[in-house]
Amino acid sequence: MAKKPVKSYQNPVINYSLPDPSIIKGEDGYYYLYATEDIRNLPIHRSKDLVEWEYVGTAFTKSTRPDFEPKGGLWAPDINKIGDKYVLYYSMSVWGGEWTCGIGCATADKPEGPFKDHGKMFRSNEINVQNSIDPFYIEEGGQKYLFWGSFRGIYAIELSDDGLSLKEGATPQKVAGTAYEGTYIHKKD
């Protein structure tokens, strides 16, 4: 029997700018990639093998696009499966708007959407943390946390049981200094 050729890749795997990627494996066997595009929306691509990618659509349409920062751009999505929902955390900001930017979330039943926006979780001026962007979700011991930050330090805060809002009474905790941006945490056994 002939051997199946091994697929290889060459960067870029998608031939246009998609910074701040977040990937999740869906129950349908596809890997789903969410990224920043032109700050107007969050494109979604999928792949069976992490080599060949196809465009699926965007997380939001013009009518469903978040608007808590009216002229704000969307970037740095973070996708997770919490319970039976796909939860998409996103940043919304205008350049120079370090006190009005913030982080919101949206949910969907399937990784390709459609996503229902739940609006802002917080803005920088509401929690006294300048430049609150670049979200990253993690769960540990049944507790849910959101990390974020961009050149003003990396912060963390505990979330509600469903992960869609801040836990009542939770306050931001600074976990890293001012020279860091874009949190990623990898668990190691």
Language model features with spans:
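Carbohydrate-active catalytic/glycan-binding domains of CAZyme proteins
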Residues: 1-189
